[in-house]
Amino acid sequence: LVILILAACGRPEPWRRDAYVFGPRIEILVQHSAGVDENSAGLAMGEVLREFERLHHTYHAWQPSELTALNTAIAAGRSHEVSAELATLIVDAQKIAAAGDYLFDPGIGKLIALWGFQGDEIVARRPDPTQLNVLLAEHPSIGDLRLNNQTITSKNRGVVLDFGGYLKGVALDRAAVIL
């Protein structure tokens, strides 16, 4: 009985919103605090979800997007002009990849696809060893990209950007600013 009384005196349940963005279901929770009412929390959570959706669609790795247009140009050996936002994301992702000795590298989109992790239905599979060796021999890396103003070129046609993991981090940073 004492536990029930203490539980009743605890914090009120947070306000929540959920959606499917970047693949899995995400949930946004806003704790009650001074000066924040349910309407303000709802507006902020809606703004976060709109930003998540915008990022998801603008930089989608396999559905038509600004990112797939860049990947197509890289594969063809062409330079490609990108938005200021994408240029900034690429520079930031290059710094993060370099800081970790390229162990986390958004330039390995072909490998991600080969393992079955690019698609509306994820079908993880063991890749054909020959195909895998061919892709590994290309050594694709976001470090192969060169930026001149907002024009991107690549010294490696095997680079395919997939911002999946990186963009989730960017989205969380933006959510923190909004909330």
Language-model region placement:
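Cysteine-centered nucleophilic/redox motifs
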Residues: 156, 160, 165-179
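A contiguous, well-ordered beta/alpha segment that forms the leading edge of an enzyme domain
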Residues: 5-164
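Sec-dependent signal peptide recognition
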Residues: 1-2
